[in-house]
Amino acid sequence: MLQRLSQWDYAISATCLGHRFNVQVARLARVISHSGDGYYYALFGGIIAFTPFAGAFWSLALPAFVIELMCYLLLKQIFRRDRPQALPVFIRPSDRFSFPSGHSAGAFVMAGSVAQIFPSWAGVAFTWASLVACSRVLLGVHFVSDIIAGASLGLLIVYGIN
């Protein structure tokens, strides 16, 4: 059964990759992926600091990000799943292993935190997080199961804290 899931995962990931050979799609996927880099969270946090909800947001988001980072690093070392090497890569990954997706986990921690504190922005936040996750597959650095695991990890942490 595990082998069948792995085959399904690879087939879906390869199909996704087949749709991003357009230069504009690859470029857009890179921009979306980079929007999930950690330093943008600090920038967003600086913006939130000027709202009356800054304390509530950071009391949820900061511990969630710390827990997410620790879990993400631990899981990468436990599973040590290589990135999809047979598939062309369109971005330089930050490390060798793919499971779980740290970008997906972080994006969903941010989206879940935004949704809890600013409910009217939940749709935008989760759409952005989903795009970050999908961009990682389109860029060839993750399998579909990596982003599902990362998104699940991020959400479990945020909603577990709250």
Language model features with spans:
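N-terminal transmembrane-helix/juxtamembrane module of multi-pass inner/ER membrane proteins
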Residues: 1-41, 72-94
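Core segments of transmembrane alpha-helices
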Residues: 36-45, 103-111
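Interfacial segments of alpha-helical transmembrane regions
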Residues: 47-70
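Membrane-water interface at transmembrane helix exits
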Residues: 49, 71-80, 115, 158, ...
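Transmembrane helix-loop junctions in multipass membrane proteins, especially transporters and channels
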Residues: 53, 80-85, 140-145
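Small-polar-interrupted transmembrane alpha-helices in polytopic inner-membrane proteins
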Residues: 63-78, 123-134
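Membrane-embedded catalytic cores of phosphoryl/pyrophosphoryl-handling enzymes
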Residues: 88-162
